[in-house]
Amino acid sequence: MVLRQVMDFAQAVEHLLHPAVVSFNPHPRSFFSGRTQPLLTPLPEKAAQLTAIGIEQLVLLPFTEKLANLSPKQFVQSILVEQLQAKFISVGQDFCFGHQRRGNVQDLQNLGQEFGITVAIAQLEQTDTERISSSRIRRALKEGKLAMANHLLGRPYALRGTVVQGQQLGRKLGFPTANLCLPADKLWPKYGVYAGWVNLNALDVPIPAVINLGDRPTVNGQEPSAEVHLLQWSGDLYGQGLEVALTHYLRPETKFAGLDQLKNQIAQDCQQAEKLLNLDGAIP
Protein backbone atom coordinates (compact mmCIF):
# COMPACT_ATOMS: atom_id res chain seq x y z
CA MET A 1 0.00 0.00 0.00
CA VAL A 2 2.82 2.45 0.87
CA LEU A 3 4.64 1.87 -2.42
CA ARG A 4 1.39 1.93 -4.39
CA GLN A 5 0.60 5.38 -3.02
CA VAL A 6 4.05 6.63 -4.05
CA MET A 7 3.72 5.23 -7.58
CA ASP A 8 0.18 6.59 -7.96
CA PHE A 9 1.30 10.08 -6.92
CA ALA A 10 4.27 9.99 -9.32
CA GLN A 11 1.94 9.04 -12.17
CA ALA A 12 -0.56 11.74 -11.19
CA VAL A 13 2.08 14.46 -11.56
CA GLU A 14 3.29 12.89 -14.83
CA HIS A 15 6.58 11.79 -13.27
CA LEU A 16 7.77 15.32 -12.52
CA LEU A 17 8.92 13.79 -9.23
CA HIS A 18 11.07 10.70 -8.80
CA PRO A 19 9.49 7.81 -6.83
CA ALA A 20 11.94 6.79 -4.12
CA VAL A 21 12.23 4.61 -1.04
CA VAL A 22 14.15 5.90 1.98
CA SER A 23 15.74 3.37 4.32
CA PHE A 24 18.39 3.25 7.03
CA ASN A 25 21.78 1.57 6.90
CA PRO A 26 22.57 -0.13 9.18
CA HIS A 27 19.17 -1.24 10.41
CA PRO A 28 18.30 0.73 13.59
CA ARG A 29 17.98 -2.53 15.56
CA SER A 30 21.53 -3.46 14.52
CA PHE A 31 22.78 -0.01 15.51
CA PHE A 32 21.31 -0.09 19.01
CA SER A 33 21.95 -3.78 19.75
CA GLY A 34 25.43 -3.99 18.22
CA ARG A 35 24.39 -7.22 16.47
CA THR A 36 23.70 -7.84 12.81
CA GLN A 37 19.97 -7.88 12.17
CA PRO A 38 19.02 -10.70 9.76
CA LEU A 39 16.96 -9.19 6.96
CA LEU A 40 14.08 -10.55 4.92
CA THR A 41 15.39 -8.56 1.96
CA PRO A 42 19.09 -7.54 2.04
CA LEU A 43 19.90 -4.37 0.12
CA PRO A 44 20.78 -5.88 -3.29
CA GLU A 45 17.58 -7.94 -3.21
CA LYS A 46 15.53 -4.96 -2.07
CA ALA A 47 16.97 -2.76 -4.82
CA ALA A 48 16.09 -5.33 -7.49
CA GLN A 49 12.52 -5.69 -6.20
CA LEU A 50 11.98 -1.93 -6.05
CA THR A 51 13.37 -1.41 -9.55
CA ALA A 52 11.02 -4.08 -10.88
CA ILE A 53 7.95 -2.14 -9.69
CA GLY A 54 9.14 1.24 -10.95
CA ILE A 55 10.86 2.81 -7.94
CA GLU A 56 13.67 4.97 -9.33
CA GLN A 57 15.76 5.63 -6.23
CA LEU A 58 16.69 3.77 -3.06
CA VAL A 59 18.05 6.31 -0.59
CA LEU A 60 20.13 4.86 2.26
CA LEU A 61 20.47 7.15 5.25
CA PRO A 62 23.55 6.33 7.38
CA PHE A 63 22.03 5.54 10.77
CA THR A 64 24.31 7.27 13.26
CA GLU A 65 23.98 8.54 16.81
CA LYS A 66 23.54 12.04 15.41
CA LEU A 67 20.62 10.96 13.24
CA ALA A 68 19.10 8.92 16.07
CA ASN A 69 19.11 12.00 18.30
CA LEU A 70 17.22 14.24 15.87
CA SER A 71 13.84 15.41 17.13
CA PRO A 72 10.85 14.68 14.87
CA LYS A 73 10.88 18.24 13.53
CA GLN A 74 14.65 18.21 13.02
CA PHE A 75 14.37 14.93 11.11
CA VAL A 76 11.71 16.30 8.79
CA GLN A 77 13.43 19.64 8.23
CA SER A 78 17.02 18.40 7.94
CA ILE A 79 16.53 15.07 6.18
CA LEU A 80 13.23 15.11 4.31
CA VAL A 81 13.12 18.79 3.34
CA GLU A 82 16.70 20.05 3.04
CA GLN A 83 18.46 16.87 1.92
CA LEU A 84 15.81 14.92 0.02
CA GLN A 85 13.52 17.78 -1.04
CA ALA A 86 10.53 15.50 -0.50
CA LYS A 87 7.15 16.62 -1.84
CA PHE A 88 5.10 13.52 -1.07
CA ILE A 89 5.57 10.92 1.67
CA SER A 90 3.72 7.66 2.29
CA VAL A 91 4.15 5.77 5.57
CA GLY A 92 2.34 3.02 7.43
CA GLN A 93 -0.22 3.79 10.11
CA ASP A 94 2.16 2.70 12.88
CA PHE A 95 5.13 4.75 11.62
CA CYS A 96 7.25 6.45 14.31
CA PHE A 97 10.28 8.69 13.84
CA GLY A 98 12.67 11.01 15.60
CA HIS A 99 14.56 10.59 18.87
CA GLN A 100 13.20 7.62 20.85
CA ARG A 101 10.43 7.26 18.23
CA ARG A 102 8.62 10.25 19.70
CA GLY A 103 6.99 11.30 16.43
CA ASN A 104 3.90 9.54 15.08
CA VAL A 105 1.90 9.80 11.86
CA GLN A 106 -0.17 12.73 13.16
CA ASP A 107 3.05 14.60 13.96
CA LEU A 108 4.32 13.82 10.46
CA GLN A 109 1.14 15.16 8.87
CA ASN A 110 1.36 18.35 10.94
CA LEU A 111 5.00 18.85 10.01
CA GLY A 112 4.16 18.08 6.40
CA GLN A 113 1.67 20.94 6.37
CA GLU A 114 4.30 23.23 7.88
CA PHE A 115 6.92 22.37 5.27
CA GLY A 116 4.68 21.88 2.25
CA ILE A 117 4.86 18.07 2.05
CA THR A 118 1.84 15.92 1.24
CA VAL A 119 1.69 13.02 3.71
CA ALA A 120 -0.34 9.88 2.96
CA ILE A 121 -1.01 7.29 5.66
CA ALA A 122 -1.34 3.68 4.50
CA GLN A 123 -3.71 1.52 6.52
CA LEU A 124 -2.17 -1.53 8.18
CA GLU A 125 -2.74 -4.73 6.25
CA GLN A 126 -4.16 -7.58 8.29
CA THR A 127 -4.76 -11.27 7.90
CA ASP A 128 -7.01 -13.17 10.28
CA THR A 129 -6.96 -11.05 13.43
CA GLU A 130 -3.29 -9.96 13.35
CA ARG A 131 -1.62 -7.26 11.34
CA ILE A 132 0.99 -8.18 8.77
CA SER A 133 4.45 -7.27 10.05
CA SER A 134 8.05 -8.21 9.36
CA SER A 135 8.29 -9.62 12.90
CA ARG A 136 5.38 -11.96 12.25
CA ILE A 137 6.91 -13.09 8.94
CA ARG A 138 10.29 -13.69 10.59
CA ARG A 139 8.69 -15.78 13.31
CA ALA A 140 6.80 -17.91 10.80
CA LEU A 141 9.97 -18.57 8.79
CA LYS A 142 12.02 -19.53 11.85
CA GLU A 143 9.25 -21.90 12.99
CA GLY A 144 9.06 -23.64 9.62
CA LYS A 145 5.62 -22.20 8.85
CA LEU A 146 6.53 -21.40 5.27
CA ALA A 147 2.95 -21.38 3.95
CA MET A 148 2.01 -18.74 6.51
CA ALA A 149 5.11 -16.65 5.79
CA ASN A 150 4.46 -16.75 2.05
CA HIS A 151 0.82 -15.80 2.62
CA LEU A 152 1.86 -12.80 4.70
CA LEU A 153 4.49 -11.77 2.15
CA GLY A 154 2.14 -12.18 -0.78
CA ARG A 155 4.86 -14.14 -2.59
CA PRO A 156 7.23 -17.06 -1.95
CA TYR A 157 10.14 -16.27 0.35
CA ALA A 158 13.23 -16.13 -1.86
CA LEU A 159 16.95 -16.73 -1.42
CA ARG A 160 19.36 -14.93 -3.75
CA GLY A 161 23.03 -15.75 -4.07
CA THR A 162 25.92 -16.91 -6.21
CA VAL A 163 26.78 -20.56 -6.87
CA VAL A 164 30.15 -21.47 -5.31
CA GLN A 165 32.32 -24.58 -5.12
CA GLY A 166 31.16 -27.12 -2.53
CA GLN A 167 32.29 -30.55 -1.34
CA GLN A 168 30.42 -32.23 -4.23
CA LEU A 169 28.93 -34.79 -1.84
CA GLY A 170 25.57 -34.50 -3.57
CA ARG A 171 27.13 -35.42 -6.89
CA LYS A 172 28.69 -38.53 -5.33
CA LEU A 173 25.25 -39.52 -4.01
CA GLY A 174 23.66 -39.05 -7.42
CA PHE A 175 21.99 -35.74 -6.57
CA PRO A 176 24.30 -32.89 -7.67
CA THR A 177 23.65 -29.61 -5.90
CA ALA A 178 24.40 -25.97 -6.49
CA ASN A 179 25.87 -24.48 -3.32
CA LEU A 180 24.44 -21.03 -2.85
CA CYS A 181 26.44 -18.28 -1.13
CA LEU A 182 23.87 -16.05 0.57
CA PRO A 183 24.37 -12.49 1.86
CA ALA A 184 25.68 -12.46 5.43
CA ASP A 185 22.63 -10.52 6.65
CA LYS A 186 20.00 -12.71 4.96
CA LEU A 187 17.43 -14.28 7.27
CA TRP A 188 17.63 -18.08 7.07
CA PRO A 189 14.35 -19.97 7.45
CA LYS A 190 14.16 -22.98 9.75
CA TYR A 191 16.79 -25.53 8.78
CA GLY A 192 15.36 -28.36 6.75
CA VAL A 193 14.39 -29.45 3.26
CA TYR A 194 12.21 -27.37 0.95
CA ALA A 195 10.69 -27.57 -2.51
CA GLY A 196 10.61 -24.56 -4.78
CA TRP A 197 11.55 -22.93 -8.03
CA VAL A 198 14.87 -21.55 -9.26
CA ASN A 199 15.14 -18.51 -11.49
CA LEU A 200 18.29 -18.62 -13.60
CA ASN A 201 19.37 -15.57 -15.59
CA ALA A 202 20.17 -17.65 -18.67
CA LEU A 203 16.69 -19.23 -18.82
CA ASP A 204 13.24 -17.72 -19.25
CA VAL A 205 11.38 -20.35 -17.24
CA PRO A 206 11.80 -21.32 -13.55
CA ILE A 207 13.34 -24.70 -12.73
CA PRO A 208 11.84 -26.98 -10.05
CA ALA A 209 14.19 -27.80 -7.20
CA VAL A 210 14.73 -29.41 -3.82
CA ILE A 211 16.59 -27.16 -1.38
CA ASN A 212 18.46 -28.22 1.75
CA LEU A 213 19.21 -25.56 4.36
CA GLY A 214 21.30 -26.40 7.40
CA ASP A 215 24.50 -27.72 8.92
CA ARG A 216 24.44 -31.16 7.19
CA PRO A 217 24.70 -33.12 10.47
CA THR A 218 25.04 -36.51 8.72
CA VAL A 219 28.48 -35.48 7.38
CA ASN A 220 29.41 -33.37 10.44
CA GLY A 221 29.05 -30.05 8.63
CA GLN A 222 30.46 -27.07 10.51
CA GLU A 223 28.82 -24.17 8.69
CA PRO A 224 25.25 -23.70 7.45
CA SER A 225 24.85 -24.26 3.74
CA ALA A 226 22.16 -23.74 1.12
CA GLU A 227 22.24 -26.63 -1.36
CA VAL A 228 19.95 -26.63 -4.39
CA HIS A 229 19.23 -29.78 -6.41
CA LEU A 230 17.59 -28.92 -9.74
CA LEU A 231 14.93 -31.36 -10.92
CA GLN A 232 14.74 -32.27 -14.61
CA TRP A 233 17.73 -30.07 -15.48
CA SER A 234 21.51 -30.35 -15.48
CA GLY A 235 24.35 -28.00 -16.33
CA ASP A 236 27.22 -25.93 -14.96
CA LEU A 237 26.07 -23.18 -12.60
CA TYR A 238 29.35 -22.14 -10.95
CA GLY A 239 29.61 -18.39 -10.60
CA GLN A 240 26.03 -17.77 -11.66
CA GLY A 241 23.44 -15.91 -9.65
CA LEU A 242 20.32 -17.80 -8.60
CA GLU A 243 17.04 -16.81 -7.05
CA VAL A 244 15.34 -19.67 -5.21
CA ALA A 245 11.66 -19.24 -4.36
CA LEU A 246 10.69 -21.51 -1.46
CA THR A 247 7.14 -22.82 -1.91
CA HIS A 248 6.90 -25.91 0.32
CA TYR A 249 8.52 -27.01 3.59
CA LEU A 250 9.13 -30.76 3.34
CA ARG A 251 10.80 -31.82 6.59
CA PRO A 252 13.20 -30.69 9.34
CA GLU A 253 16.94 -31.23 9.19
CA THR A 254 17.82 -34.79 10.23
CA LYS A 255 21.00 -36.66 11.10
CA PHE A 256 21.03 -40.05 9.38
CA ALA A 257 22.98 -43.16 10.36
CA GLY A 258 24.93 -43.18 7.11
CA LEU A 259 25.15 -41.99 3.52
CA ASP A 260 22.94 -44.78 2.15
CA GLN A 261 20.11 -43.72 4.43
CA LEU A 262 20.67 -40.10 3.45
CA LYS A 263 20.60 -41.01 -0.25
CA ASN A 264 17.30 -42.86 0.15
CA GLN A 265 15.76 -39.92 1.97
CA ILE A 266 16.90 -37.46 -0.72
CA ALA A 267 15.20 -39.65 -3.33
CA GLN A 268 12.00 -39.51 -1.27
CA ASP A 269 12.35 -35.74 -0.93
CA CYS A 270 12.60 -35.43 -4.71
CA GLN A 271 9.51 -37.57 -5.22
CA GLN A 272 7.55 -35.52 -2.71
CA ALA A 273 8.71 -32.28 -4.33
CA GLU A 274 7.67 -33.55 -7.76
CA LYS A 275 4.13 -34.16 -6.51
CA LEU A 276 3.87 -30.83 -4.70
CA LEU A 277 5.19 -28.90 -7.70
CA ASN A 278 2.89 -30.80 -10.07
CA LEU A 279 5.68 -31.99 -12.35
CA ASP A 280 5.06 -34.36 -15.23
CA GLY A 281 7.44 -37.16 -16.07
CA ALA A 282 10.15 -38.88 -14.10
CA ILE A 283 12.89 -37.03 -12.29
CA PRO A 284 16.34 -37.90 -13.65
From Swiss-Prot:
UniProt entry tagged with the keyword ATP-binding: yes
Biological or metabolic pathway of the protein: Cofactor biosynthesis; FAD biosynthesis; FAD from FMN: step 1/1; Cofactor biosynthesis; FMN biosynthesis; FMN from riboflavin (ATP route): step 1/1
UniProt cross-references to Pfam families, sorted A to Z: FAD_syn, Flavokinase
Catalytic activity line of the entry: riboflavin + ATP = FMN + ADP + H(+); FMN + ATP + H(+) = FAD + diphosphate
Gene Ontology MF terms: ATP binding; FMN adenylyltransferase activity; riboflavin kinase activity
GO terms of biological process kind: FAD biosynthetic process; FMN biosynthetic process; riboflavin biosynthetic process; riboflavin metabolic process
Keywords: ATP-binding, FAD, Flavoprotein, FMN, Kinase, Multifunctional enzyme, Nucleotide-binding, Nucleotidyltransferase, Transferase
EC numbers: 2.7.1.26, 2.7.7.2
Protein task: Catalyzes the phosphorylation of riboflavin to FMN followed by the adenylation of FMN to FAD.
Family the UniProt entry places it in: Belongs to the RibF family.
PANTHER family from the UniProt entry: RIBOFLAVIN KINASE (PTHR22749:SF6), RIBOFLAVIN KINASE/FMN ADENYLYLTRANSFERASE (PTHR22749)
Protein name, UniProt field: Bifunctional riboflavin kinase/FMN adenylyltransferase
Native organism: Synechocystis sp. (strain ATCC 27184 / PCC 6803 / Kazusa)
